[in-house]
UniProtKB/Swiss-Prot annotation:
Active site annotation, chain numbering: D275
Keyword Ligase annotated: no
Species per Swiss-Prot/TrEMBL record: Pyrococcus horikoshii (strain ATCC 700860 / DSM 12428 / JCM 9974 / NBRC 100139 / OT-3)
NCBIfam families on file: PRK04250.1, pyrC_multi
Gene: pyrC
Database matches in Pfam families: Amidohydro_1
Protein name: Dihydroorotase
One GO cellular component, as annotated: cytoplasm
Length: 417
């Protein structure tokens, strides 16, 4: 091919294998994967021992802003995203005020256009209201942060014109069991699965945390249903509550048996997402539920690769390829013609997680002091370096995702590529 705008040279992951070569970038898109060194106007040579991966997609992020800008802003949260190797975030709509009408949705988009350092998808909350056109829809089956939930899940689910991300905790059981034991999640998952099977509508179940909940999803095996797990449910358990009262989260941290079952079935889990939910330390001490995670999720997973718990392909499948396919994102993925979103990881870098080095306003992390091996050292968004060696580069240049159309039909296997 003729000369391109930018060539990134080094080892990169391609079809489950790490190969030597180069990636040609033209007009913000991946123009060519090559086994040889392509010619370009500019060149980035990735040092030996480091690997080029696709920019990652986090389908579950709470960026606060609006009346909770003291907790997080779109600017601070998307800086945290690109610092952690996340190039596209899905913005959860249970904000203050909540995104439940077209006017608020448009205001949200205006702020993103001006302030976002990463690309983004806009969510819309349904709880008895009529949906406006968004990139995805969110339904809470029980109260969480913000307190708004659906009183009639089937009716609200039926209204949604595109894929629904559901917080599966049954509201009637929450009232009876405020500590939210596994049954609260399992009953809600069963209810959501039954509705999806009946309506044949796409559904994404957020933060599956229990052995029995995951069993229900796998047993149902509904082609248009996807789901996610979070790093905190993979790496923490109820025993961690003993070391910190700040770890309150919905759904709660579970028993070791649940955590182990998630790991044992990781190949069947299509998506890993952070559920980044920042609060100030004061709010956490007062009982707010939610954990920050944008700047630790990839680090924890790279460390797991080094420990032989997962493969680097698992990360790419569950945080790039599958999210782009399941949510029908036309311009994202690890293919020629898609946006040139790349990250460079140093698999040998040993470091200690410290909240003081993060961009999120949360100012704390559940993993403070953890020693990990593997780090994101560069983030490229649509052909531009936006983060290198922990420093954010340039001004906000985030753009809204481009959808292929409504996310529907067979979502395919969890490891499709």
């Amino acid at each position: 091919m003729t000369q391109v705008d930018l060539v990134v040279v080094g080892k990169f992951l391609f079809k489950e294998k790490i190969i030597d070569g180069s990636i040609g970038i033209e007009d913000d898109k991946i123009a060519k994967f090559s086994l040889r060194e392509l010619k370009g106007d500019k060149k980035i040579k990735v040092e030996k021992g480091k690997i080029i991966l696709p920019g990652l997609i986090d389908v579950h992020v709470h960026l606060r802003d609006f009346n909770e800008s003291y907790k997080e802003t779109i600017a601070s949260g998307t800086k945290a995203a690109i610092h952690g190797g996340i190039t596209t975030v899905f913005d959860m709509p249970n904000t203050k005020p909540p995104i439940m009408d077209e006017k608020t949705l448009k205001l949200r988009e205006l702020i993103f256009k001006k302030k976002s350092y990463s690309d983004y998808a806009l969510g819309f909350l349904i709880a008895g209201n009529e949906p406006a056109k968004a990139d995805f829809y969110k339904i809470f089956m029980g109260a969480s942060t913000g307190g708004i939930y659906s009183k009639n899940f089937e009716e609200d689910y039926k209204k949604a014109p595109d894929i629904v991300s559901v917080h599966a905790e049954e509201y009637e059981l929450i009232n009876r069991y405020p500590e939210r034991p596994p049954i609260v999640e399992v009953v809600a998952i069963k209810k959501a699965l039954q509705a999806s099977k009946k309506m044949k509508k796409p559904l994404h179940i957020c933060h599956v945390s229990t052995k029995d909940g995951l069993k229900e999803i796998l047993k149902a095996n509904i082609p248009w249903v996807s789901f996610e797990v979070t790093p905190h449910h993979l790496f923490l358990t109820r025993r961690d509550y003993e070391r910190s009262k700040l770890l309150k989260v919905y759904p709660p941290l579970r028993d070791e048996e649940d955590r182990r079952y998630l790991w044992e079935n990781l190949k069947s889990i299509p998506i890993i997402a952070s559920d980044h939910a920042p609060h100030t330390l004061e709010d956490k001490e007062a009982g707010a539920a939610g954990l920050p995670g944008l700047e630790t999720e990839v680090a924890l997973l790279l460390d797991a690769v080094n420990k032989g718990m997962i493969t680097i392909w698992d990360i790419v499948a569950k945080m790039s390829i599958n999210p782009a396919r399941i949510f029908k994102i036309k311009n994202k993925g690890w293919e020629e013609g898609k946006d040139a979103d790349l990250i460079v990881v140093d698999m040998k870098k040993e470091w200690t997680i410290k909240a003081e080095n993060f961009y999120t306003k949360a100012n704390w992390t559940p993993y403070e002091g953890w020693k990990v091996k593997g780090k994101v050292i560069m983030t490229i968004l649509r052909g531009e370096v936006v983060m290198e060696d922990d420093e954010i580069i340039g001004k906000p240049r985030g753009e809204r995702i481009v959808k292929e159309g409504n996310a529907q039909g067979n979502l395919g296997s969890s490891q499709e590529h």
